[in-house]
Amino acid sequence: MNDLITIVVPVYNVEKYLPHTLESICGQTYTNLQILLIDDGSTDDSLAVCHKWARQDNRIQVYEQENQGVSRTRNKGIQLAIGKYVMFLDADDWVEADMLESLYRLAEADHADVACCLLREENQLEETDNCTTTERTIIHGKNKTESGLALLTVWGPVCKLYRKDLIENIQFEEYKVAEDLLFNTNVVCSEKFERASLIQYPFYHYMIYAGSAMKQEFQDKYLEAMRVEELCYEKLTKISPEFADINLIGCSVSRVFEKYAALSPEKKKQYKAEFKYCKKFAREHKNALLQTKDRHRKISGWLKVYIPDFYLWTLSRRMRG
């Protein structure tokens, strides 16, 4: 008999999108599921949607709590999980019908601690497609470093099937952003973690709506993301310098530059101190920005470190068209 898989779905004010998400879960070809819907103090009808679906499918268990944030909600899901494997799913995303079956069979065949796949971003505000592959090639991690790189192909906890005994003592920490990257960093750094395998196919559909957390205008939390990504970089490169190729520092600095460049002149004045901090951060991490095999990244890193205001000007001009 196939092992039980637990799906953890934090729910918060997603009544509009939740039915499509649940339809994709309940319609999986892999059917031995524990589906945990944890309502985090929603103020819309999300909880009613959860209960409606629970009445239709006895695999669904609904839990309610006062608003505590996504990290505590996911942690509660780990505590409640009784499956051999655990998967996290955001309540406004959806997954293809054979995702769980494909990841489960890969995990079992490879004796993998984590089986992963890619994701496809679907932007409801504009036409985008960040992943065009239709093949299902597989990367089998042969050691901890290869496995860690495979796991971190997608930084977040979604599109992954974790062994429950691997993550049962690993917590999502309470940051506003990048807490999911830190969780996976701690998974990779765990003594229990040995192997991950990756199907290079986007079974997971990541939906981008107006107001999505990392698609908003410049906010202070982007500086917090820089500090969290710095912590992850330090932890991972202690295991192997190969983790520098993930470009954690480069991505975090680039995000702030791009968000700041998109601001109006008045808004730029408002966030001048934050951008000054970002430039200082880039100088302090110049080795991480410049030690890359990718020529484009190296040039971009050099510009951010040595002539950041010129680089900002070119970004702003490009955004204005």
Labelled PLM ranges:
Residues P202-Y209, K215-I246, G250, S254-H285:
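Catalytic core of nucleotide-sugar-dependent glycosyltransferases
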Residues M99-E174:
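Flexible acidic/His/Gly-enriched loops in nucleotide-sugar-dependent glycosyltransferase catalytic domains
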Residues V86:
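Short aromatic/hydrophobic "clamp" motif used to bind/position activated sugar donors
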Residues Q65-A81:
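Glycine-rich, basic loop-to-helix element that forms the pyrophosphate-binding segment
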Residues N13-G27:
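Short, well-formed alpha-helical segments that are part of the catalytic scaffolds
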Residues N143-Q219, E224:
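Conserved nucleotide-sugar donor-binding catalytic segment
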